[in-house]
From Swiss-Prot:
Name of the protein this chain belongs to: Threonine--tRNA ligase
NCBIfam families assigned to the protein according to its UniProt record, in alphabetical order: thrS
Lineage of producing organism: Bacteria, Pseudomonadati, Pseudomonadota, Gammaproteobacteria, Pseudomonadales
Physiological role: Catalyzes the attachment of threonine to tRNA(Thr) in a two-step reaction: L-threonine is first activated by ATP to form Thr-AMP and then transferred to the acceptor end of tRNA(Thr). Also edits incorrectly charged L-seryl-tRNA(Thr).
Pfam families xref list: HGTP_anticodon, TGS, tRNA-synt_2b, tRNA_SAD
Species of provenance: Pseudomonas entomophila (strain L48)
Residue ranges that the Swiss-Prot or TrEMBL entry lists as coiled coil: none
Amino acid sequence: MPVITLPDGSQRTFDQPVSVAEVAASIGAGLAKATLAGKVDGKLVDACDKIDHDATLQIITPKDEEGLEIIRHSCAHLIGHAVKQLYPTAKMVIGPVIDEGFYYDIAYERPFTPDDLAAIEKRMQQLIDTDYDVVKKMTPRAEVIDVFTSRGEDYKLRLVEDMPDEQAMGLYYHEEYVDMCRGPHVPNTRFLKAFKLTKLSGAYWRGDAKNEQLQRVYGTAWADKKQLAAYIQRIEEAEKRDHRKIGKQLDLFHLQEEAPGMVFWHANGWTVYQVLEQYMRQVQRENGYQEIKTPQVVDRILWERSGHWSNYAENMFTTSSENRDYAVKPMNCPCHVQVFNQGLKSYRDLPLRLAEFGACHRNEPSGALHGIMRVRGFVQDDAHIFCTEDQVKKEAADFIKLTLDVYKDFGFTDVAMKLSTRPAKRVGSEELWDRAEGALADALNESGLEWEYQPGEGAFYGPKIEFTLRDCLGRNWQCGTLQYDPNLPERLDASYIAEDNSRVRPVMLHRAILGSFERFIGMLIEHYAGVFPAWLAPTQAVIMNITDKQADFALEVEKALNGSGFRAKSDLRNEKIGFKIREHTLLRVPYLLVIGDREVETQTVAVRTREGADLGSMPVAQFAELLSQAVSRRGRQESE
């Protein structure tokens, strides 16, 4: 007689084992119809699963976060059902849930086309409309092997081989189609109506480029059509903001096949890049960092000592010269330890903060490259703080405050902070981990802001803090990090003289605020849709004459503004003023200055904004003050 305790504390007693669906039906017909699955004693189970003991139960519906994940996972299985009907020789591989959607990897004799994608989606919709039940069968391993052998599903058999020899596995039947999964899944396809397939891409078996290539079908699914429509609208807006498209429109950068994953910065884009670098240089100088520069190409001996050669070699670009092996640095930290190691260091020298705009290169898979967001050559606002264990909390607290201030200057105020703690496989004593995690947690608490733990997500040698920004489309971008590291100083023999004259290893704090400049600029382009705040805009003001008679004064204004440290250009082309205004508005120039005969006579400029606001005529000095105020606000006016 199982006694079921519901979330509100009420209890229901049953005479025999009862399924989640039956419990829901005993509560009400509406809940029974909405039931996707259940959470029994905290564990997700299918709606058909029986409960044979006293237990707590939460009914999972599409309104729950877990419910949405179940819907998406079931949609992935539905791809399999549709694909096997349309392309019977296709081999199904895996179909997991991802952020806001799902995908299925498939082996097929030819690449799928957009027409195939449309056909698969149409067949999925037809299958959903039949409202068939999804049937779960717990099946002995030997029988599972027989099922997939008879169907020629080679990849499923390879997956079964990797799984522990359990008594039974979950097989989910979508009519004639069967897939293997831990579950849970929807009980009926009526829950899958709000879905859409989104794109095709390539993939590799087990994610290894040495293995056979597969095709990946992506999709998204939501609790209802309204949520799906909102998502599609958001994606369409994101496509309009695609940094690759805007980068071309604004002449910021380009990429080409001869240098995959390497950015060709044009004058406009390089201006934005330089503003970022100069800003971060000023910020770091004001906060006690020493800027250094370290070599690009370093002997493998250093990478062996640091551990990168054995753990990261496949991602490193290497070369040889005069019988010596070298690597182009994928990260800056080992080189920064070399700078620290020059000369004797005392505890009085700590904390020592070494910063570098370090150019790094990583041999990312070509299929993973994406515009300037995911590249092979990039620059980091990288720094390493060498300090004593007692100084960690203050250094971390100062870094948190600095990082949040920097993000505000770029218009980002929605920042999530997470503390990743000790993983199962780790080095160092429990006491060391306790102190390290405690120092970072205390620093986070000192900020007065909310943060959360990520248990087990730390590096094997130490905990870390991650900063995730949310942009105007609600997308999350992991940017800043603070990594506690006692390991690299040990490997590279870094030490300082303590107060008692003993040699002690420093703690090394790896930290970055923007991360990769390339990726951060890509984020800014999409966040602002290319409408950069005045301080970042490649051209801050354009001066336009109406006729040739005003050309000399236009050039005087340009010279005066540039002489005051602004970025101004004149447009003296023999075009109608309306044409010029439209063109520079499309180029997202913040301020458009028009000069006619009246402006020449009064020595003023007629000021318009790219948003179309007419600010009237004013002396050049007054406009310079207006522009100066806009620049000094940086991106904060965009977020306040």
